[in-house]
Amino acid sequence: MELFLDPSTWAGLLTLIILEIVLGIDNLVFVAILSEKLPPCKQDKARLIGLSFALFMRLGLLALMSWMVTLTSEIISNKYFSFSGRDLILLFGGLFLLFKATIELHERLDNDIQKNENNKHYAGFWTIVIQIVILDSIFSLDAIITAVGTINNLPIMMIAVVIAMVLMLIASKPLTKFINLHQTVVVLCLSFLLMIGCNLVSEALGFYVPKGYLYAAIGFSIIIEIFNQIARRNFMLHQSRRPMRQRAAEAILRLMIGDQFRNTTTNISTKNKDKEKIRNRTTDTESFKEEERYMINGVLTLAARSIRSIMTPRNEISWVNIYQPKNKIRSQLLDTPHSLFPVCKGQLDEVIGIVRAKELLVALERTINIIDFSSTTLPIIIPDTLDPINLLGVLRRAKGSLVIVTNEFGAVQGLITPLDVLEAIAGEFPDADETPDIIFEKDSWLVKGGTDLHSLQQCLNITNLIKQENSYASLAGLLIAQKGQLPLPGETIVIPPLRFYILEATQYRINLVRITKQH
């Protein structure tokens, strides 16, 4: 009892507890790695049982202190080498650490490892417990030797070991959660295990490496890993502020398109030689076709598009003027490959109904009043500010009819059919009286001025033509905004990495443009 009244005893006890905890941190890390091989419901139990057994083993080693002191005497000796009991323990312990670290690193670095929990094969419970006890026994050697060198009092040493082990038991669960959330820490710790194993083997063979070098290397690596974790955390924080839809779309596009996709917003480069090698090893049936990439990109970017980029523009609408002669209306219906027509009074903004060409031809043959006939099917009108997702619901309610798009003043801007939405996703389907909007020639593209910018971006594999603050949706709108006025034929406009040469233009619009890439 008088022993605990001595202040030096309390100072020694506190010092020894701190040393035991510091020397046991590495043990906790590897206990967490081992327990991860068990089902989640058994991990806590394995840690508690394993560390409890390890506690009794440490107490047993302390009780046999007098015998441990004699471990420095030679047991095996000849003219080539000599080993003491301590050397043999260090040798076999170091070899065990090297073997265990190599196996664990191989599993962590193997790309074929199954991450699916349903297919994951867990290790046996007692197998992991035994490994925890063995691992703790190896790591406890330095702690036991430290205890012997610090205080030459067995009860104080046992109290310090018990307190340190209880604190380690409490800290084992949160430390395990941290390691499971940060897998790079696991690889780092396994690398430490290799270093420690090599050091134990070299020390057993008589090659003494100053512990300061080992601790300096471990400390420096930990600092670098802390920087990596901070950078990772800041990256995830910045990513969380971006719209989830945009992040999901970019992740899928990077997966499908690989090196061809570049996110200019976050300046993340996806050029990766390893990915290219992996992609080259896949067969043609496994890789994504260009059409599949185009459609996936169209689906993911549909919500970000404007109605103006999807609709058929006003100048391309085929409509019926009821004030025209019947024979001219009949010729128009027969010559135009459309099945639905807006019927208007003199101008497109005066829509009275949407009719089918076949039904209107029958009405003309039977001399039915066209105004009364067309008024039975009223047009569905939507504003040009409607988003594409809500547009899908409108098209479903239209039941195959077309939808008229107007601006805030009621002027018709265009029309939309289900085919227009399909073209926004899968690409252009030209009618019989149309030519493709984009025609590829040698090292250049011939593009109509009214071509949608989203389709053009996908075709040219670029991402810098569309800006959210701009209202234009066509190539002509982009070039006029870039020039500040309507460009003339023969003029060239440069928007890196592209060069736009105006081939055909009138006083009112751009008809045809040749696009080349800058060299």
Curated annotation (Swiss-Prot):
CDD domains assigned to the protein according to its UniProt record, in alphabetical order: CBS_pair_CorC_HlyC_assoc
**Transmembrane portions of the chain:** 13-35, 48-70, 80-102, 123-145, 150-172, 185-207, 212-231
The record's subcellular location field reads:
Cell membrane
Matching entries from Pfam families are given as: CorC_HlyC, TerC
Write down the superkingdom of origin. Answer: Bacteria
Which PANTHER family does the annotation name? HEMOLYSIN-RELATED, UPF0053 INNER MEMBRANE PROTEIN YOAE
Spell out the protein name for this chain: UPF0053 protein bbp_300
